Structures are given as structure tokens and as C-alpha cells.
From Swiss-Prot:
Its cofactor is Mg(2+). Signal peptide: none annotated. One of its GO terms (molecular function) is magnesium ion binding. The gene is bioD. This is ATP-dependent dethiobiotin synthetase BioD. Gene3D superfamilies: P-loop containing nucleotide triphosphate hydrolases (3.40.50.300). One of its GO terms (cellular component) is cytosol. ATP binds at residues 56, 117-120, 177-178. It comes from Xanthomonas euvesicatoria pv. vesicatoria (strain 85-10) (Xanthomonas campestris pv. vesicatoria). PANTHER family: DETHIOBIOTIN SYNTHETASE. Its main location: cytoplasm. The active site is at 39.
């Protein structure tokens, strides 16, 4: 893989960033890479005997090889299922770059590729003074865009790609994640996305209820 790490963002909340990220991890591992996931900030965590845990972060941990320590994979685990800025304020936490950068550096020593999953859509802030673009810039990461394929996705994908470029960052690929089984003319919509997005498509994840990320990884075609 040309890039030792990349940042996975999405066209919105709930469009399958975690499925895209875990499928990427399995695809990378299938190529023989040591690949680990990271979820720098996660809200909506549940309290367990081991501490606060997030479902998406646990999925990334399970898909990783080697499997990193949870606190390194998810430095900020916030209880409330809210925007990170609000969830952090609820527990008196101020999100900062330094702990994330430190954890990221540790993960880089453990694997060949680190897949960093963002929060919500690209413009969702991390705090009052910290945008996702700031984090991506600080970690010097290219971006992979997961497009939730449903009505309106062409608009959302083009706006997100334009926002990433306007922030001076590079989007190196996109993944079509089919999230609406009732969507009409899906092939044509994906074709329109291919025509209008400048970066290459890294494959598609079909609507397949109950399928795990390892199975969905077969739909991806990663660059060499």
C-alpha cells in the first residue's frame, strides 16, 4: 500500500464509515499487510468492566491485526450519543490533538497501515476549536470517502469532495456503500458518481444484511 495511513470520512452520519473502515482493514490484511484501525473520538460509549467502550471502535479493534490496546485505538471514549463537542462537554473533557497524535504514532509502530475513522460527515467538528480537517492536517493523512448510496448521494458526495479539497487536503479514493435496498436505478447513480468524482472508486459494498466486514471486503479493489 502506497500510504501508511489514511482517514476515512463519510457523506453523513450513519452511512457506513465503520463498515467501510473494517472492510478496508480486511482487504489490506488479505494482501498480507499488518493493518490496524483507529477511532480517535467516539461518542455513544457503553460502560463495561474494562471502561467506556464504543461499538464502532470495538469493530475496528476486532478487524485489526495485530489488535491494539483499546485506549490507543480510541483515545477519547465519550458516553453520550451526541456530537463530540457536546459529549465531551458533558464529562468535562476538552478534545485536543496531542493525545490523538501520540496514540497514532504508537499505532504506526505496530502496523504497516493505520485506518483512521472519523466522526459523522467531514464538516462535523470535534470541538469548538478543532475540525476534522485540523486533525487530518496534523497527522498528514490522505482521505478516503465512504459514500452512503441513497437518494441525494451525488450531491452529498460532490459537496464533501469539494470541502475536502477546499481544506487543502487530498481525497485519494471513494467507496460506494449501498445503504438503501429500495433505491431505484442504483447502477446508474454509482455510474454518475464515477463520472463526477475526480478520485478513483475503491469498490462497492453491497446491501447484504448480516454480512460481516470480511465478506464485504471482497467488493473492494484497493490501489497497489
Amino acid at each position: 500500500m502506497q500510504h501508511p495511513a489514511f482517514y476515512v470520512t463519510g457523506t453523513d452520519t450513519g452511512i457506513g464509515k465503520t463498515m467501510g473502515s473494517t472492510a478496508l482493514l480486511h482487504a489490506l490484511r488479505a494482501r498480507g499487510h499488518r493493518a490496524v484501525g483507529m477511532k480517535p473520538v467516539a461518542s455513544g460509549c457503553e460502560h463495561t468492566p474494562q471502561g467506556w467502550r464504543n461499538e464502532d471502535a470495538l469493530a475496528l479493534q476486532a478487524a485489526s491485526d495485530p489488535q491494539p490496546d483499546y485506549a490507543t485505538l480510541n483515545p477519547y471514549a465519550l458516553p453520550a450519543p451526541l456530537a463530540p463537542e457536546l459529549a465531551a462537554a458533558d464529562v468535562g473533557v476538552t478534545l485536543a490533538l496531542e493525545p490523538i497524535a501520540h496514540a497514532f504514532a504508537q499505532l504506526l509502530t505496530q502496523a504497516e497501515v493505520v485506518v483512521v475513522e472519523g466522526v459523522g460527515g467531514w464538516a462535523a467538528p470535534l470541538s469548538a476549536t478543532l475540525d476534522q480537517a485540523d486533525l487530518v492536517r496534523a497527522l498528514q493523512l490522505p482521505v478516503v470517502l465512504v459514500v452512503g448510496v441513497r437518494l441525494g448521494c451525488i450531491n452529498h458526495a460532490r459537496l464533501t469532495a469539494a470541502a475536502i479539497a477546499a481544506d487543502g487536503l487530498q481525497c485519494i479514493g471513494w467507496i460506494a456503500n449501498e445503504i438503501d435496498p429500495q433505491m431505484e436505478r442504483i447502477e446508474e447513480n454509482i455510474g454518475m458518481l464515477r463520472q463526477r468524482l475526480a478520485m478513483p472508486c475503491w469498490g462497492r459494498i453491497p446491501w447484504r444484511p448480516g454480512a460481516d466486514a470480511a465478506a464485504q471486503a471482497h467488493g473492494l479493489q484497493l490501489p497497489r
